[in-house]
Amino acid sequence: MAGKGNPVPGPHLNGFPVPTYSYFFPHMLGSLSPPALPGLPISGYSTPSPATIETQSTSSEEIVPSPPSPPPPPRVYKPCFVCQDKSSGYHYGVSACEGCKGFFRRSIQKNMVYTCHREKNCIINKVTRNRCQYCRLQKCLEVGMSKESVRNDRNKKKKDEKKPECIENYVLSPDTEQMINRVRKAHQETFPSLCQLGKYTTTNSSERRVALDVDLWDKFSELSTKCIIKTVEFAKQLPGFVTLTIADQITLLKAACLDILILRICTRYTPEQDTMTFSDGLTLNRTQMHNAGFGPLTDLVFAFANQLLPLEMDDAETGLLSAICLLCGDRQDLEQAEKVDILQEPLLEALKIYVRRRRPHKPHMFPKMLMKITDLRSISAKGAERVITLKMEIPGSMPPLIQEMLENSEGLESGATGSRPSGAPPGSCSPSLSPSSAQSSPPTQSP
């Protein structure tokens, strides 16, 4: 008990001053603290908090800086599972290079349909991966690339966008408007519309289907040759096309020529008479088209023409869709596939803006148009096979330009044109691309 007049001593526990605990057992104070004694005031100090004591107990250690940790070694991925090229990481479930990642993504997003012109067992490696798109896609799937991952990735991007249809401003920039006008002009100069033509008909084999009407074939092959030349003229007017290597220009024309020919003739379909009209005005019904050389393609082409009717495409849209068909980086044997894709991007954007400005209440019209490219490719693959069988049916030889431009469509083996060095003379592969032949050839009309 403290004497009278003496200061009241600090609180004690079992005869020891409390503060001594902070020095004898600092490691225990994080969980233990002495109980407060009721009625005894605390003078001159307060019990240190566990955080303060912890700081005191470790302050000496913090004075000495720890050595910096070494940077982690660069991550090394296994070679691309598809082509064995250097991998850039794991994409869609497997280790893959940028090329195979992009090829797989485009193939799934665009629902591409490929055809193998060999035995569906092509070797896919760094050198051969662009030669057969069918086998390359199959290899992507075999090694474990996931279609669902592509779709999920696309859906995620869509969700991240805040209602794009509400906030997108479909205003044509001056550059985009200039591009649309340029493509429209190129299309109109190489393909007159139906309303500009004076129709005429023929009675040749109009009643029943036959294997081949030679007179109709002669006329049809003449018009088709002119149409191919006009397609080349159209291509040369597209932004950036002539900046590609000559080899790539020829590869793209061979791959897309039949797509463009079918798209064009189908825009001249008259459903009331079930007829199609060529650029000289010749109008053939379904039976005559069959007998002129279309054969088993006839019903496919007429069905496609019927599918185009609800789209009500004008010259700008037909020209842009033709240009998109042509400038497609997925074509096999391209030397500069990435450059082709870069040329295609502004065409896609121009078509999207133009279509949605023209039809503001039909937001699905643009994707519907793009889906027609898949239909065209499917018909064209059968069309290239039809050119081969025609050679056995016609009495004479196949017109050289038709054979060169259509038979070799997307890799049918009639000469390895796609592998020709880019420095080779243009005329050595395609007369229509040769400047000399372009100057000497008379003005033509396309079918």
Swiss-Prot record:
Residues 80-145 bind DNA. It comes from the Eukaryota. Residues 146-174 are annotated as: Hinge. Pfam families: Hormone_recep (PF00104), zf-C4 (PF00105). It is found in: Nucleus. Residues 1-79 are annotated as: Modulating. Residues 414-447 have a biased composition (Low complexity). A zinc finger (NR C4-type) spans 80-100, 116-140. Residues 47-61 have a biased composition (Polar residues). Residues 175-409 form the NR LBD domain. Its main location: nucleus. InterPro entries: NHR-like_dom_sf, NR_DBD_RAR, NR_LBD_RAR, Nucl_hrmn_rcpt_lig-bd, Nuclear_hrmn_rcpt, Retinoic_acid_rcpt, Znf_hrmn_rcpt, Znf_NHR/GATA. Receptor for retinoic acid. Retinoic acid receptors bind as heterodimers to their target response elements in response to their ligands, all-trans or 9-cis retinoic acid, and regulate gene expression in various biological processes. The rar/rxr heterodimers bind to the retinoic acid response elements (RARE) composed of tandem 5'-AGGTCA-3' sites known as DR1-DR5. Heterodimer; with an rxr molecule. Binds DNA preferentially as a rar/rxr heterodimer. This is Retinoic acid receptor alpha. It comes from Takifugu rubripes (Japanese pufferfish). The gene is rara.
